[in-house]
């Protein structure tokens, strides 16, 4: 099974993230590299270079760009996704994360748990949208989708 062995975020020109966003980014990147599934299907009947892959994520011209190379720097794929389908779920995710970060500081565990469940639900929705948008471009499992969605949110935060 193919996977991502290295990931970078092109956040040049974006404002610095908050400490909470930076922590989310670090955790998502670590977890992603520990365990992920990322398979590129053949394109137009031609095979694609096999992984593991180095993936760079960027937002360019209001599009999410996946730049995928092999470990030997051979171009494997590049695809651009419209950010439109992600806008509402990213906005909802940031709002619930803000509530969660505030709750952790001052609310009892039962209320934190309720907010966390809502946060996970929105995160799952964003992951599902990502899997749909990548259909035919890359096959990823739900855990990989969740971690990549977190990184997309980090890029959105600055953009």
Curated annotation (Swiss-Prot):
Q: Which domain of life is it from?
A: Bacteria
Q: Which family does it belong to?
A: Belongs to the UPF0262 family.
Q: Give each disulfide bond as a residue pair.
A: none
Task: Write down the InterPro entries for this protein, in alphabetical order.
Answer: UCP032146
Provenance organism: Roseobacter denitrificans (strain ATCC 33942 / OCh 114) (Erythrobacter sp. (strain OCh 114))
The protein here is known as UPF0262 protein RD1_1069
Q: Which NCBIfam families match?
A: PRK02853.1
């Amino acid at each position: 099974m193919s996977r991502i062995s290295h990931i970078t975020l092109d956040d040049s020109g974006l404002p610095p993230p908050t400490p909470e966003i930076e922590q989310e980014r670090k955790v998502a990147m670590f977890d992603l590299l520990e365990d992920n599934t990322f398979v590129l299907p053949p394109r137009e009947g031609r095979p694609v270079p096999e992984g593991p892959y180095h993936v760079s994520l960027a937002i360019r011209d209001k599009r999410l760009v996946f730049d995928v190379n092999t470990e030997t720097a051979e171009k494997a794929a590049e695809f651009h996704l419209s950010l439109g389908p992600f806008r509402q779920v990213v906005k909802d995710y940031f709002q619930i994360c803000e509530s969660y970060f505030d709750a952790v500081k001052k609310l009892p565990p039962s209320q934190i748990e309720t907010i966390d469940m809502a946060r996970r639900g929105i995160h799952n929705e964003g992951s599902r949208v990502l899997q749909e948008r990548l259909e035919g471009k890359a096959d990823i499992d739900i855990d990989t989708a969740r971690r990549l969605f977190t990184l997309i949110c980090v890029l959105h935060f600055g953009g």
